[in-house]
Amino acid sequence: MADSVLAAVRVAPSTTELRELPMPELSDDAALLKVEVAGICGTDVKMYAKPPFGDPVIMGHENVGTIAVAGKKFKQLHGVAEGDRVFVEHYVGCYNCEWCRIGEYRHCEATDWRTNTDARRYGYTSSENPGTLWGGFSEYIYLPWNAVLHKVPDGVTAELAGLVTPLSNGIEWALLAAGVGYADTVLIEGPGQQGLSQVVACKQAGASKIIVSGTTRDKARLDLALELGADDVIDVEQANPCETVMDLTAGRGVDFVLDCTSRAGVGPVLLGIDALKRREGTLLIQGELAAFPDFPIKLLTEKAITIKSARGHSYRACELALEQLSSGRFPLERLSTHRFGLDQVDHAIRALAGDTADKNVIHISLMPWLGKEK
C-alpha cells in the first residue's frame, strides 16, 4: 500500500485543494477504508460555504467503501474482513453513554462538534487530529475502533449504498420521529434528497395519500416524486398550495406535514399549520430555520397541533435503509444523478447548490477512484 493518500482538503470558505497526506499508522483495533463513494448533500453545501471553524477538514460524511486493511481486534469487534463493503456512519461515538448503548450515536457528546472541540465526526473533524483521514473526499479514511459500520448487502452497489444517509433520514424523520403510518395522509414540502426519501418511507409505511410540494424549478424532482410513490404534486408558484391540499383531501387537510425545505423562511411552516387537519395533526420541522417572529401559537393550540423536530438518524434507520435498497422495490437509483472525481470536489458541491450548468441535480456521488481504476 502507498505511503500517502490523496485527499481534497477544505482550506478556506468555498475552497478545497488536493493534498498528499501521510497514510496513518494503524493499531490492532483500527482499519482503513478504501472509499468508493462519498455522497454530497445540502449539509456539505452549507459547511463548504461557511465552515464552522478554520482548521483544514476533509469533508465527506456519507461514506461507502471496502475494508482495505484492518487490525485483528478491529475485525473481531466489527465482524468484518478485508474486502467487505460497508457503509460508515459519520458519527464516531464513545460507545459508553446512554445514547450509544441504544444505537443513537447522533446524540453522543463525543461526536457533537458544536459542543465538543475534540469531537470525532466524519466530514467535520480536522485533518490535524490523530488519524488524519476524517472525511470521505479522500482515497482512504481512517476507522478507529469506535467507528459505526453497516455491512452492505450483496447486490447493492457502492453508488446505491451511497444513498443510505438520505434514505435513513427519511425513515428516521417520517416514520420513527413523526410517526407516519398506515392510511395516513401526508404533505411533504421540498422534493430534494430528504423529501424524496420521505416519499419512499411514507409509501412503504402504507400512507394513503402522499402530496409533495415544490417550486417550478423542481419539476424534474416533482416528476420523480410521482415515480417513487407520491399521489400528487404541487408547484407552489403555479397554484395556491393550501387550497390545492384541501381540494386533494376533500377539505379535510392532511394528518402529517413534513417540512424539509431549505432556506425557504417561515412560509413552509405556516403552510403546514394551515394544511393540517382540523385537530391533532403533526408538523415535523427539519430545516435550518433559526427564528420565527410572531409564531402563531394561538392557532397551533386551537388545532391541537403537535410539533416535532428531527436531525440525523439512528443505527436502526440505517439498517432499514439498506434493507430498502436491497429489496429493489423502488427505483432508488434515480436519486443518484451525478458522478464526480476527487479533482472535481469544488464543482460537485457547487453543482448541488445550483451554481453550475449541471441539470436536475439531486444526489451526487463523489468517487475518489473515478477514472483511476479499470
Which residues make up each language-model segment?
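Glycine-rich cofactor phosphate-binding loops and adjacent beta1-alpha1 units
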Residues: A177-Y182, Q204-A205, I211, K219-D223, ...
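Glycine-rich beta-strand-centered segment in the early N-terminal region that forms part
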Residues: P24-A38, P51-R101, Y105-R106, P153-G155
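Mid-domain Rossmann-like dinucleotide-binding core that forms the NAD(H)/NADP(H) cofactor-binding site
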Residues: G83, E139, V148, P153-A239, ...
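Cysteine-cluster motifs in flexible loop/terminal segments that predominantly coordinate metals
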Residues: C41, E89-H150
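Receiver (REC) domain switch-region micro-motif
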Residues: V86, V186, D255-V257
